[in-house]
């Protein structure tokens, strides 16, 4: 049986903490929250401490942050309807660009693997794709209006320029750029959840996606490409995503975030019942009918809702979480 061991409890933000994001090198992370501030934390010896506080970029709650793949830039999505781009080019972090266009709160932000594209989504039901046009220059490449409700999350595929979004309309959408006319189109709609989808994440090679929802379930989706050996039909030669596994009964309230570890294959969930749960694929799992078991759980990981969980991209088994209770926790998962 696995274990979830608490290594550090960190405080500093005022009010609820919405998001945490590991730097690609794994020795630094950023956090954001209700206090309109971003904190950059780093590890010295065995102690995590705040090195920088960025408090002049947003007028309202900061909902999510993400580092660029190169680690030079940090993007922050805010309820003030803007996305800020921060960099350390001058030695100190500063806001070098503010992306405007959304009509309401920006809920999520994500960099493509190449670092050349940025996606944002909002309560205004739209997903925007921005091209990095040069030093601190961003151009809107597409405005996608496929969802019928508030869009909660955007995540890029780990190897291809394919974007996934999750919404209050209970669906996940996939987008890709048409090679002929260079227009971004919705290429797939994933339906199975019965309530708001809060979080999505790809596995290491991007052939599977995990989602979590207000309906208290976690679902695993698999990509079936044209000519697949399973015989799954692919109309218009488009990849089809099918729900191949549903995990239910483990969570008692809405699941707000899910993270699929690229190093170990473990899945972590952040739940409104204050718990963190870790799932592992079973040894007899089949490609078209995968099975997962709960490896371990901490039912009272935080004193209030857990808003985000993120696996360290470098240190296998290290997990970070944040909560409405105003704390950040760093955990070690053993199998």
Curated annotation (Swiss-Prot):
Checking SMART domains in the record gives: WD40
Q: Any keyword Isomerase? A: no
Q: Name one GO biological process term.
A: protein maturation
Question: Might you report a single GO cellular component term?
Answer: metallochaperone complex
Q: Which UniProt keywords apply?
A: Repeat, WD repeat
What single Pfam family name could you report for this chain, choosing any that match? WD40
Task: Tell me where the WD repeats sit in this chain.
Answer: 12-51, 57-96, 101-140, 146-185, 192-231, 250-289, 301-335
Q: What does this protein do?
A: Essential component of the cytosolic iron-sulfur (Fe/S) protein assembly machinery. Required for the maturation of extramitochondrial Fe/S proteins.
Write out the similarity annotation: Belongs to the WD repeat CIA1 family.
HAMAP family named among the record's database cross-references: ciao1
Name of the protein described by the UniProt record: Probable cytosolic iron-sulfur protein assembly protein Ciao1
Q: Which organism is it from?
A: Drosophila yakuba (Fruit fly)
């Amino acid at each position: 049986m696995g274990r979830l061991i608490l290594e550090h409890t960190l405080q500093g933000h005022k009010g609820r903490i919405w998001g945490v994001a590991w730097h690609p090198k794994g020795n630094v992370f950023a956090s954001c929250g209700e206090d309109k501030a971003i904190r950059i934390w780093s590890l010295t010896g065995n102690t995590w401490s705040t090195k920088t506080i960025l408090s002049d970029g947003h007028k309202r709650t900061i909902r999510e942050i993400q580092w660029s793949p190169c680690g030079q830039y940090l993007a922050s999505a805010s309820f003030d309807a803007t996305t800020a781009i921060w960099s350390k080019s001058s030695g100190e972090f500063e806001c070098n660009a503010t992306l405007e266009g959304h009509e309401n709160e920006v809920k999520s932000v994500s960099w493509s693997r190449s670092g050349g594209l940025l996606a944002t989504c909002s309560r205004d039901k739209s997903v925007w794709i921005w091209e990095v046009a040069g030093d601190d220059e961003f151009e809107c490449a597409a405005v996608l209006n496929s969802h019928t409700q508030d869009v909660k999350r955007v995540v890029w595929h780990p190897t291809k320029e394919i974007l996934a979004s999750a919404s209050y309309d209970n669906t996940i959408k996939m987008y890709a750029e048409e090679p002929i006319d260079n227009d971004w189109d919705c290429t797939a709609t994933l339906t199975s959840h019965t309530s708001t989808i809060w979080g999505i994440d790809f596995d290491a090679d991007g052939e599977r996606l995990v989602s979590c929802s207000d309906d208290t379930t976690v679902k695993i989706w698999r990509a079936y490409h044209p000519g697949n050996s399973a015989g799954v039909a692919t109309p218009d030669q488009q990849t089809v995503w099918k729900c191949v596994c549903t995990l239910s009964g483990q969570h008692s309230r809405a699941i707000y975030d899910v993270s699929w570890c690229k190093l170990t294959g473990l899945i972590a969930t952040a739940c409104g019942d204050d718990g963190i749960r870790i799932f592992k694929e079973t040894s007899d799992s089949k490609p078209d009918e995968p099975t997962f078991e709960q490896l371990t759980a901490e039912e009272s990981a935080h004193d209030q809702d857990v808003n985000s969980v993120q696996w360290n991209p470098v240190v296998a088994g290290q997990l970070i979480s944040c909560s409405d209770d105003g704390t950040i926790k760093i955990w070690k998962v053993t199998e």
